[in-house]
């Protein structure tokens, strides 16, 4: 994908993975609009890369359309939309209803709402690219965090549906599925999340590097941690064996926290 003068929007780009992707895109010649709930953070990254900053709340139905509309005009149209905003919510069935709803709104419905705004124009033009930051949790699971795991699976499923439905009509859909990344989200993932993910955690810049490679080759799954492909294959090959392995991992983590 030639990014020269390409209009791109990156959500959740005030820091972490989103900011790193925005910097890489701008460095490759794209015209980038930085979107974040934190208006100051969005403006700071935008000023750094010579782009535009548009605040927006990916957790609300009214929060997605305005940034898409505001970004589209100065960019001359959005050719690449990076749905990166996400939220980590821990716990299991006992997690409060509000936590489950927040995870659903940010991790899933923000993608749906962005697609609702963008797809008609992309179909009319015959091209567009929709890239979502999912997580390896969407391919596997995340111990200690049912809302996060469930909504990331749903985000991946929506990406698969989008690709199957629109892939032959000019719309490329890609899902980025890293394991641990050294961001605020990792720090807030709780003792279980940190114990599992920290040993193999990579930087946001390494994720952005993988994204740039993925944009060039167009693959659906972008895996900054290559070992995720083996874990995903093992899960599909023998799900019961894989689940038994996850239970053993959970037991080791709990022993370490005792």
Where are the regions a protein language model picked out?
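Conserved mid-core segment of classical short-chain dehydrogenase/reductases
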Residues: 65, 87-101, 124, 144-147
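Conserved glycine-rich cofactor-binding loop
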Residues: 7, 14-15
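Active-site helix of classical SDR
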Residues: 115, 151
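C-terminal helical subdomain
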Residues: 175, 191-231
